[in-house]
A protein has these predicted regions:
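Glycine-rich, often acidic, oxyanion-interacting loops/wings at catalytic, nucleic-acid
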Residues: 1-91, 220-223
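Residue-level detector of well-ordered alpha-helical segments, enriched
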Residues: 11-18, 102, 118, 152, ...
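Short helix-capping/linker segments at secondary-structure and domain boundaries
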Residues: 15-16, 73-76, 112-115, 162-171, ...
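Generic, well-ordered alpha-helical scaffold segments in large soluble proteins
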Residues: 22, 71, 75-78, 109, ...
Length: 255
């Protein structure tokens, strides 16, 4: 279903970009959001620069865009309903920046979470680890590897950007995550690099909650295992510390 949605999305973007490009050639610029307001048909019909035969085919292309948009909205609604009724997706969506589309994509691509022995394994699986460039005695870190599922990676980075904007406006309720973001901001990290770093952290969080089988618990987040109550220690795997798992107590719904 995720593959079908991605195909609809590609076809919609391609059709809309083609429509926009043809209209611009005839001196009829189309701004963002015009498609949703149903003004394109009016703009094309009232234009005196475009010949009638061109108008007819532009309206056909416009109708194709609308049909693709309806299909995309329909399948997105289905995925949201599926995520709302799925236990694993519910746990994944407890992470800030992850909504139903991202959650269902991650569930489909992760498979068995036990195959990721370390947090870095799942980050590398989605291509969010930096490239290592070694020459002689020097070793440098480059951009991310961009391996794995491209759609899931782009959704995670998009979600990370939303979380960063919420944190900048003071709307993010997670104190541990706010502290982490503030620490990275003090390093004057570029926006794109910060989004990738936060997306990687979100993946580590997803791995932790799926292995433990629980959602976030803000009360015990950021605390060493030895200092937890005895009834809470069983939720921690081995000798790992929950300090590796920031524990937001809210979720942000985005695609």
């Amino acid at each position: 279903i995720q593959a079908v949605r991605e195909q609809f999305r590609k076809e919609y973007i391609q059709s809309f970009v083609s429509l926009k490009g043809i209209c611009q050639r005839w001196g009829l610029p189309i701004s963002k959001g015009v498609m949703n307001k149903n003004k394109v048909e009016e703009l094309v019909s009232e234009s005196k620069k475009i010949p009638q035969e061109v108008k007819d085919w532009l309206l056909e292309l416009l109708q194709s865009c609308r049909e693709l948009q309806k299909r995309l909205n329909k399948i997105s609604k289905y995925l949201k309903e599926y995520a709302d009724n799925d236990e694993i997706c519910q746990k994944i969506m407890s992470v800030p920046g992850i909504g139903p589309i991202t959650a269902t994509r991650l569930k489909a691509t992760i498979g068995d979470i036990q195959r990721f022995e370390k947090p870095k394994s799942i980050v590398a699986y989605y291509g969010l680890v930096p490239k290592s460039k070694a020459t002689g005695h020097n070793e440098k870190k480059g951009g991310i590897t961009r391996r794995g599922d491209r759609v899931a990676r782009s959704l995670l980075i998009e979600g990370a950007g939303v979380v960063l904007n919420l944190a900048a406006k003071g709307f993010l309720r997670s104190k541990p995550l706010n502290k982490w973001i503030e620490k990275k901001r003090k390093l004057k990290m570029p926006w794109g690099k910060l989004c990738c770093a936060l997306a990687a952290k979100m993946l580590r969080i997803v791995r932790a909650i799926l292995i433990q089988g629980t959602s976030f618990n803000a009360k015990i987040a950021g605390v060493a295992r030895c200092s937890l109550p005895k009834e809470s220690r069983n939720n921690v795997m081995g000798n790992n510390k929950l300090s590796e798992i920031p524990s937001p107590n809210g979720s942000v719904y985005i695609h």
